[in-house]
Amino acid sequence: MDQQRLTHLKQLEAESIHIIREVAAEFDNPVMMYSIGKDSSVMLHLTRKAFYPGKIPFPLLHVDTDWKFRDMITFRDTTAKKYGFDLIVHKNPEGLAAGINPFDHGSSKHTDIMKTQGLKQALNKYGFDAAFGGARRDEEKSRAKERVYSFRDKNHTWDPKNQRPELWRTYNGQINKGESIRVFPLSNWTELDIWQYIYLENIEIVPLYLADVRPVVQRDGMLIMVDDDRMKLREGEQIEHKSVRFRTLGCYPLTGAIESQANTLTEIIEEMLVATSSERQGRAIDHDQSGSMELKKRQGYF
């Protein structure tokens, strides 16, 4: 990796740390969304840098759908214990009581109830006025047009036509009671930037990002990993063991793996250099209807 690339990453790092510190100073009750993925791991690392040697001055929130990969939950709990940050785990109690799951209720309903409504419940319960997220503009077209400070009304909904100008590095955090801001410090990073930064900073990640032989089934054009005994096989489906890894992580029945032999960070970076598709190709929730992600964001999804 040449000096120019290092300089580029240091510029991104400085911008992100500036945004994180700005929010901590400007808002009364911020929170960081911690989804356990690679972007969350980078954002957590940047946050620890931003306030070092002090502790992170706000809690981390994980909205748990009860369908995350087991490796993700293990990694979450281990990381929280290692760094001693304040971790809030919220599950939608109504969704759990109703037995909402991606198999019987589909990706759209499952995501709305267990993620979107669960997130809104947690934000209301704790009264957070700003919430950090690890979304990047290169991931998906609706995210590409979202501001760093993304205004949300009292119902947590997003109106892409009602966004505030962001000139240079000046962000408008003025809100009325009940309104909030979603903040995206990694907006200008790319997937390749994330992986190179993870490599350079030696950031720990969930093992699922590295290739290994795993049990999978072919479903709807994706390789779905059989992560526990709740996996419901469709007629004709056969479990195969393939060398796969994940570019993105979510609920395991809705997240597709890719066939890969890349089991080191350098090999992942080499794959990224020739990749021609978005990592979100492996997320079923992005394809359950036309304009799916923008509709979800309008309803309160991250």
UniProtKB/Swiss-Prot annotation:
GO terms for biological process: hydrogen sulfide biosynthetic process; sulfate assimilation. It is an enzyme of class 2 (transferase). Pathway: Sulfur metabolism; hydrogen sulfide biosynthesis; sulfite from sulfate: step 1/3. Residues 280-302 are annotated as: Disordered. One of its GO terms (molecular function) is sulfate adenylyltransferase (ATP) activity. It catalyses: sulfate + ATP + H(+) = adenosine 5'-phosphosulfate + diphosphate. It comes from the Bacteria. Its EC number is 2.7.7.4. It holds the Pfam family PAPS_reduct. Keywords: ATP-binding, Nucleotide-binding, Nucleotidyltransferase, Transferase. Belongs to the PAPS reductase family. CysD subfamily. Heterodimer composed of CysD, the smaller subunit, and CysN. With CysN forms the ATP sulfurylase (ATPS) that catalyzes the adenylation of sulfate producing adenosine 5'-phosphosulfate (APS) and diphosphate, the first enzymatic step in sulfur assimilation pathway. APS synthesis involves the formation of a high-energy phosphoric-sulfuric acid anhydride bond driven by GTP hydrolysis by CysN coupled to ATP hydrolysis by CysD. This is Sulfate adenylyltransferase subunit 2. It comes from Vibrio cholerae serotype O1 (strain ATCC 39315 / El Tor Inaba N16961). The gene is cysD.
